[in-house]
């Protein structure tokens, strides 16, 4: 099975669109894989553990990170002062690859991760090739000038108008640069997940 088809299958299983292709497919077939129509209803109430596991999987796949990374983020969120769920949101959303995606420079989170790893992204004018690199308020994330003629970035530039930046990001005049103005709130993040369930899962 191709990666694209696997992402579609995972999207249907978890009821989240991980890619644009998955979103279109789910519009046509809004039910899990293995079921042959919307008329089939699954019976039985999901246990607390299964709910927590499901939300953890949904969150991990939306940010395209490994289980070990997610566990570390959750544990740090609990140890840090403040609301653990809010802490988790901010830690994940301030990752460099997440901000490349939110800024509209990539069509998917995996693509954003790849762009960073391949050295196409700068933070405050310096190349950074670590997708998990934390970005701080005031930092500017940008596509390198030498990379802006790559078709993927040309396409992203053409589609920026249709993809408004979230309120905690400010797109700069050149289009392929954005500033993190502040840390996001849970309500502002475009992620389909009950963050509190994820915290509960790792607190077991």
Where in the sequence are the language-model features?
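Short, well-ordered loop/turn sites that connect or cap secondary structure elements
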Residues: 115-116, 135
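Ferredoxin-like alpha/beta domains used as RNA- or RNAP-binding modules
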Residues: 1-103, 130-204
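Beta-rich strand-turn-strand
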Residues: 106-109
